[in-house]
Amino acid sequence: MKAYLEAQEVALMEKATINLRDRLLVRLLFHLGCRVSEALALTVEDVDLGRSTITIKHLKARLKLSCINCGQRLGRSHVFCPKCGGRVEKAQTEQQERHRQRVLPVDGDTLSMLKDYIRRGGPVVRDGKRLIFGINRHRAWQIIRGCAEKAGLPKLVNPETGTIHNVSPHRLRDAFAVHAVKLDDSGDGLRLLQEHLGHASFDTTAKYRKVAGEELKNWYARLWNKKVRSDEQKSDGH
């Protein structure tokens, strides 16, 4: 049983979608390798059509602010540092918040799909924000699982735990990472992948090298299984 999706299988999922919104969701999760929470938080303003980039806001961990003078942890409402009494300047807070974002390049085909989606009025206005998708996490899971089933894709196995699970939004992020590692598993390549995925730890990124290595192990196993069967057939023939 497979541990991850191939690019061709993700393409089948795209074809299995019933509308442009769902197709764009599948494409962004795979081509950006972003988390589903990050994709659902995307706004029209996060898309820079001129530079062909998308700004992803880190949502996995709560934003941590600290005083640049003494290192004291700060809350968003703090005007003065409770430890050293220093004034918390707005510019200082904004500079620290920028570390919780990453700007990702977007390929031409995905950018064209985004342009078409925005032009057709796909984004949803909510709380003053023009959200790209305007759906919740549960609905996103339903869409991805439904597309995978419609495309005839099998369930996947977790290479770390051995558990079997349906195709989910995070499996598209995994597919992007494994696809990238197959093309470049050098130290520099993994560092770039770490930055792209927004991993705080390099070890989290490096695990995809191990997952990609499963392909070689499976090939080797099939090779010997075929040889054993062939030898057995010859033996039976004598």
What are these regions (language model features)?
Residues 3, 7-32, 36, 125, ...:
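Basic, Lys/Arg- and aromatic-enriched nucleic-acid-binding interface segment
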Residues 197-222:
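Catalytic-site neighborhood detector that most strongly recognizes the C-terminal catalytic loop/helix
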Residues 122-128, 142-195:
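Short, basic (Lys/Arg/His-rich) helix/loop patches that form interaction surfaces
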Residues 175, 221-227:
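Short, basic, alpha-helical segments at the C-terminal edge of helix-turn-helix-like DNA-binding modules
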Residues 29, 40, 194, 206:
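The alpha-helix within a helix-turn-helix
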Residues 41-116:
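Conserved tyrosine-mediated DNA breakage-rejoining catalytic core shared by Y-recombinases
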Residues 77-95, 109-149, 156-160:
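Major-groove DNA-contacting interfaces characterized by cationic-aromatic clusters
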Residues 10, 21-23, 137, 141, ...:
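Short, leucine-enriched amphipathic alpha-helices that occur as contiguous helical runs
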